A protein has these predicted regions:
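ATP-binding glycine-rich loop module of kinase domains
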Residues: 14-56
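A short glycine-rich, hydrophobically flanked beta-strand micro-motif that places a catalytic Asp/Glu
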Residues: 73-78, 124-136
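Protein kinase-like catalytic core scaffold
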Residues: 36, 71, 85, 141-144
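Hydrophobic core positions within the conserved protein kinase catalytic domain
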Residues: 62, 116-120
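Conserved structural core of kinase catalytic domains
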Residues: 51, 70-109
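Juxta-kinase regulatory segment immediately upstream of eukaryotic protein kinase catalytic domains
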Residues: 1-16
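Structural motif at the C-terminus of the N-lobe alphaC helix and the adjacent alphaC-beta4 loop
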Residues: 60-71
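C-lobe/activation-segment region of protein kinase-like
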Residues: 108-110, 120-126, 135-180
Length: 180
């Protein structure tokens, strides 16, 4: 892991790897005592998802989601040449962590359902997997920018909610089976 990365010539100290997704690696980065998420796009194959231009998709999906009013981290900067984006860091446990620790509440489920009430009329689904939702000060944020055209089979009620409690699907995932 690199100790420093730049976005459009501005250097950020890389603290740790936060996670790897379908489209890139997300790092906790710092500059002047402030925390950020720095995402480096990757081009590793993904058997269940087809990508076009990932940087363009990040920018377009952010604008689309922002227009719906769901809570998500601010897109601060994009470095097209290096295929990196800089996002606001939302500090807190993931919904996955909360389920594992038996701390998932009806209030958090209600907040993701409220996001659906904003997304579905716009013809959108997001990735409802609980690793990409973070709770900060009892407020749930969707920390990814991925969104897709609405399909009933991939909505919260038919797919995502299976991973928001200790269901068979959740336990299979935690014990090594793949959910995505």
């Amino acid at each position: 892991m690199q100790k420093a990365m730049t976005i459009n010539g501005t250097e950020f100290n890389v603290v740790s790897l936060l996670g790897k997704g379908k489209g890139g690696y997300s790092y906790l980065a710092e500059r002047d005592g402030k925390k950020f998420v720095l995402k480096q796009i990757h081009h590793e194959p993904c058997s269940y998802y087809t990508f076009g231009n990932k940087i363009e998709a990040e920018q377009n999906d952010y604008a689309t989601l922002k227009s719906t009013g769901i809570r998500l981290p601010k897109l601060i900067d994009t470095d097209v040449k290096q295929e990196r984006i800089l996002k606001e860091f939302i500090d807190g446990p993931t919904a996955m962590d909360l389920v594992k620790q038996d701390k998932m509440t009806d209030a958090y489920i209600g907040q993701v359902k409220e996001m659906c009430r904003l997304l579905y009329p716009a013809g959108l689904n997001i990735d409802y997997f609980p690793t990409i939702f973070v709770v900060q000060n009892d407020v749930l944020f969707y920390i990814d920018y991925e969104c897709n055209n609405y399909m009933e089979e991939w909505n919260l009620e038919n797919w995502g909610i299976k991973y928001w409690s200790k269901t068979k699907e959740f336990l299979d995932y935690v014990n090594g089976s793949s959910a995505q």
